[in-house]
Curated annotation (Swiss-Prot):
Annotated protein name in UniProt: Coatomer subunit beta-1
PANTHER family, alphabetized: COATOMER SUBUNIT BETA
Taxonomic path: Eukaryota, Viridiplantae, Streptophyta, Embryophyta, Tracheophyta
Functional summary from the UniProt entry: The coatomer is a cytosolic protein complex that binds to dilysine motifs and reversibly associates with Golgi non-clathrin-coated vesicles, which further mediate biosynthetic protein transport from the ER, via the Golgi up to the trans Golgi network. Coatomer complex is required for budding from Golgi membranes, and is essential for the retrograde Golgi-to-ER transport of dilysine-tagged proteins.
HEAT repeats: 49-87, 92-126, 127-164, 274-311, 312-349, 391-428
GO cellular component, one term: COPI vesicle coat
Quaternary structure and partners: Oligomeric complex that consists of at least the alpha, beta, beta', gamma, delta, epsilon and zeta subunits.
Location of the protein in the cell: Cytoplasm; Golgi apparatus membrane; Cytoplasmic vesicle, COPI-coated vesicle membrane
Its membrane topology: Peripheral membrane protein
Cross-referenced InterPro entries: ARM-like, ARM-type_fold, Clathrin/coatomer_adapt-like_N, Coatomer_bsu_C, COPB1, COPB1_appendage_platform_dom
Length: 948
């Protein structure tokens, strides 16, 4: 039998106390030394030591002591020691303590009486308790409430013993009388608890006869009342109507704990709209009134559960839920937004967006550290609202565009992605968005935000004025050309006597010029304009945000600038009738592109231009020099069509996910029938009628029946020993979120009784055994079940191994049967999850642990291999289907999952098909902790070869 521990005491194993030292201290007259010795003895007992020689010493020298601390420690000691022999009979020496316990129960000091009564609550031996029953009963009438409340608990514990009802035949009647006369709140609560536990009918009768007074009862008593109601309604569901009235009355209680329990009880007992609405309102009120963040998070979890099961009712309370955003805690705000976004409808969208806009404005105050992160969450929420309900986009897009220059790059990136989607899905807003973007473009200082903003300018500037404004804005943000002077180039290259000539492909003519020191140098025509220093003055329009970024070596941005200018020039050709103006603009664009190439190949630049950016800019130069209709169509139409296709796929994916969620809805074709008219009312309240209707619907739709998958249960059984071993063992493994439960069936296959049989387990990885192994006796050819709990603290592949050790009467030595290892699968702890591309990239950059697994598989199709990896790792593919379809010989995809411990698992699959048809490449796993990266890597290595 597993023993329940009533205390936890720290014990330093490095300094074990010797039994003789303890004995000497106990025999002395020093009270402090006795206290210290008793503590050491208790610690030894708690850690599995048996010190039987101390028992008589304690009876002689400790039992008579009047010191309260010693008496308390004595009771702890008596609780811990073994009181029975191997056959379950009480040891004869235990009778010695009965007289002392009786004396304590009649002691003039109420503390001694109280702690002794509390000790009796934990006594399971009827032979020890029986002689004490008269003294226990006398304490029911003691003047002090501390004694009375513990006397009631002692009677309850004794009454629950196997033969307890014979020791206290009329205990329920006595306690019922006590309950009617008792004035102490705690004693009254204990009395009601005793009736609820031992005589439920009496408790119910007392409750129903005092219905009007329930709301005035003490908080602890009200909590027991709710527990009783839950218990009664499970066994007698037909009677829950009258109890729900009591719960509704308790919703107005002063105690927050009672109100919370009332709401939970209502939800568990009834699915009637009135009951659910009352519970949801209660949670929302508590959410605003409670200051503890942990309490708020628990309440949000309850609201999330209600949203999942009763969305229609929760929709009415969305504004109440959103009020939780007033909390400065980011976790609370994130959960609040997650719940609210699923409750948005056409009726409440305007209110919700208005509230979110107010919150965005509040973040500009800059008082809190994490305002940027909170603003990012709000922007993402508004984005989701605008995608679901395009009509609200016009009310928020201009407000959010003020944050394009936000110092929080992630927040600014979310804004620009939002603007990009809205300008495509809401054509009416195109003109106002472009105008606002061109006006505020100079404020954008983030290298990740500028490319997206430039793409929007290149794609959506359609009229002549817009195209000209777009080109003008880009030119101003680049500043004066070139990006450096020749004198600046010579400074970092003092070791070189000559200035490296610029490639002839980039210049049209050369001529000698006189430098500042009087020497001659060759200069290209591209450098004939006034020289400007690469020093950037922040915040000024003329300094140019694009210029500043280019001078830091961001040539990917340079390639985007070149592409945007190319698109604008091609569109200018269509809307501008004057060829002269077009040619001027082409020349200006070419000058900018050549200057960027010149900067990229100059030692002034901190980083040389990369090949991809170089080729892209050169392509733009060639295109502007040799324009044709086919290229114009590709640049002006095909790029936009690709984006439109991407948005359409995203919307389709979201619709499919929404459909998948709503497939579990319980709406039926006959929902419109008013069942109330078919019921005989019989004085039933509205809530009772609703509840009965809901139960009928559940019964009709089969919601009350739940099938157990026995086949699945059998699959979890692991064989631990061989059939030829003297002891056969198999384990059924149940994996919970934070622990693993092992149910080990042990069969004695011999003709002898196995004594001191013990299941010894050990773990490897982040697994910990919760309890100490117990010894058992197993009869010949009999079986027994041994349970073991193992705590899991992280997502890491763990191993459980061990032995079964036993003794027989014939052999003095212990026999050992080695068990097969039990491997705990990481797949039990991770589940597919979704995150934005920006969030994925941010985490990818931040996470320090990476595990790189080489592709080694017999699968020859790229998509088939990816699907196999997704299935094997239980992850979600974040890459759009359109990006990975087709036969192009290579594939790259991102996968994401989350563990039950909140850990993120990121996987990037990059594969290429070789000429012989085999796949090669790498699967890279990144995570914050080493365990999940290694475990996932091992899993992929194991699974990637096969197709099963």
């Amino acid at each position: 039998m597993d023993k329940s521990s009533t205390m936890l005491v720290h014990y330093d194993k490095g300094t074990p106390a010797v039994a003789n030292e303890i004995k000497e201290a106990l025999e002395g007259n020093d009270v402090e030394a006795k206290v210290d010795a008793m503590k050491k003895a208790i610690m030894l007992l708690l850690n599995g030591e048996t010190i039987p020689q101390l028992f008589i010493t304690i009876i002689r020298y400790v039992l008579p002591s009047e010191d309260h601390t010693i008496q308390k420690l004595l009771l702890l000691y008596l609780e811990l020691i073994e009181k029975t022999d191997s056959k379950g009979k009480v040891l004869p020496e235990m009778i010695l303590i009965c007289q002392n316990l009786r004396n304590n129960l009649q002691h003039p000091n109420e503390y001694i009486r109280g702690v002794t009564l509390r000790f009796l609550c934990r006594m399971k031996e009827t032979e020890i308790v029986e002689p004490l029953t008269p003294s226990v009963l006398q304490n029911l009438e003691h003047r002090h409430p501390f004694v009375r409340r513990n006397a009631i608990l002692a009677i309850m514990s004794i009454y629950k013993l196997p033969q307890g009802d014979q020791l206290f035949v009329d205990a329920p009647e006595m306690i019922e009388k006590v309950l009617s006369t008792e004035q102490d709140p705690s004693a009254k609560r204990n009395a009601f608890l005793m009736l609820f536990t031992c005589a439920e009918e009496r408790a119910v009768n007392y409750l129903l006869s005092n219905v009007d007074k329930v709301s005035d009862w003490n908080e602890s008593l009200q909590m027991v009342v709710l527990e009783l109601i839950r218990s009664v309604c499970k066994t007698k569901p037909a009677e829950k109507g009258k109890y729900i009235k009591i719960i509704i009355s308790l919703l107005s209680a002063t105690s927050s704990a009672v109100i919370y329990e009332c709401a939970g009880t209502l939800v568990s007992l009834s699915s009637a709209p009135t009951a659910i609405r009352a519970a949801a309102n209660t949670y929302c009120q508590l959410l605003l009134s409670q200051s503890d963040n942990n309490v708020k998070l628990i309440l949000l979890d309850r609201l999330y559960e209600l949203k999942t099961l009763h969305r229609d009712i929760m929709v009415e309370l969305i504004i109440d839920v959103l009020r939780a955003l007033s909390s400065p805690n980011l976790d609370i705000r994130r959960k609040t937004l997650d719940i609210s976004l699923d409750l948005i409808t056409h009726h409440n969208i305007n209110e919700v967006v208005q509230m979110l806009k107010k919150e965005v404005v509040k973040t500009q105050s800059g008082e809190l550290e994490k305002n940027g992160e909170y603003r990012q969450m709000l922007i993402q929420a508004i984005h989701a609202c605008a995608v679901k309900f395009p009509e609200v986009a016009s009310t928020v897009v201009h407000l959010l565009m003020d944050f394009l220059g936000d110092s929080n790059v992630a927040s600014a990136l979310d804004v620009v992605v939002f603007v990009r989607e809205i300008i495509e899905t809401n054509p009416k807003l195109r003109v106002s968005i472009i105008t606002r973007l061109l006006d505020t473009f100079y404020q954008i200082r983030a290298g990740k935000v500028c490319p997206c903003a430039l793409w929007i300018i290149g794609e959506y500037c359609l009229s002549l004025s817009e195209v000209e404004s777009g080109i003008s804005t880009i030119t101003q943000c680049l500043g004066e050309l070139p990006f450096y002077s020749v004198s600046e180039e010579s400074e970092p290259t003092e070791t070189s006597k000559k200035i490296q000539p610029t490639s002839s492909a980039m210049v049209s003519s050369r001529k000698p010029v006189i430098l500042a020191d009087g020497t001659y140098a060759t200069q290209s025509a591209a450098s004939e304009t006034t020289f400007s220093s690469p020093t950037v003055v922040q915040g000024s329009l003329t300094s140019g945000n694009l210029r500043a970024l280019l001078l830091t070596g961001d040539f990917f941005l340079g390639a985007v600038v070149a592409c945007t200018l190319t698109k604008l020039v091609l569109r200018l050709e269509e809307v501008q009738s004057s060829k002269t103006e077009v040619n001027k603009t082409v020349t200006q664009a070419l000058l900018i592109m050549v200057s960027m190439l010149q900067l990229g190949q100059s030692p002034v630049s901190p980083h040389p231009i990369d090949n991809d950016s170089y080729e892209r800019i050169v392509l733009c130069i060639k295109l502007l020099c040799h324009r044709n209709d086919e290229m114009k169509k590709i640049w002006l139409e095909s790029c936009r069509q690709s984006f439109v296709k991407m948005i359409s796929e995203k919307q389709l994916r979201e619709m499919e996910e929404l459909k998948a969620k709503t497939q579990t809805t319980h709406a039926q074709p006959d929902d419109l029938i008013d069942f109330f008219h078919l019921k005989s009312r019989k004085g039933m309240s509205q809530l009772e009628l609703e509840d009965q209707v809901q139960d009928d619907l559940k019964r009709a739709t089969g919601e009350f029946t739940k099938d157990e998958n026995d086949a699945n249960k059998l699959n979890r059984i692991l064989q631990l020993t061989g059939f030829s071993d003297p002891v056969y063992a198999e384990a059924y493994v149940t994996v919970h979120h934070y622990d693993i439960a092992l149910e080990v069936t042990v069969i004695n296959r011999t003709k002898e009784t196995l004594q001191n049989l013990c299941l010894e387990l050990a773990t490897m990885g982040d697994l910990k055994l919760v309890e100490r192994p117990q010894n058992y006796s197993l009869a010949p050819e009999r079986s027994m079940q041994i349970k073991a709990n193992i705590k899991v603290s992280s997502t890491e592949t763990g191993v459980i191994f061990g032995n079964i050790v036993y003794e027989t009467s014939n052999v003095m030595e212990r026999n050992v049967v080695v068990l097969n290892d039990i491997h705990i699968d990481i797949m039990d702890y991770i589940s597919p999850a979704v995150c934005s591309e920006v969030a994925f990239r941010t985490m990818w950059a931040e996470f320090e642990w990476e595990n790189k697994v080489a592709v080694n598989t017999t699968i020859q199709n790229e998509r088939e291999f990816l699907d196999h990896i997704i299935k094997s790792t239980n992850m979600k593919c974040l890459t759009a289907p359109s990006a990975i379809e087709g036969e192009c010989g290579f594939l790259a995809a991102n996968l994401y999952a989350k563990s039950v411990f909140g850990e993120d698992a990121l996987v990037n699959v990059s594969i290429e098909k070789q000429t012989d048809g085999a796949l090669s490449g790498y699967i890279r796993i990144r995570s914050k902790t080493q365990g999940i990266a290694l475990s996932l890597g091992d899993k992929i290595t194991l699974k990637q070869k096969g197709s099963s």
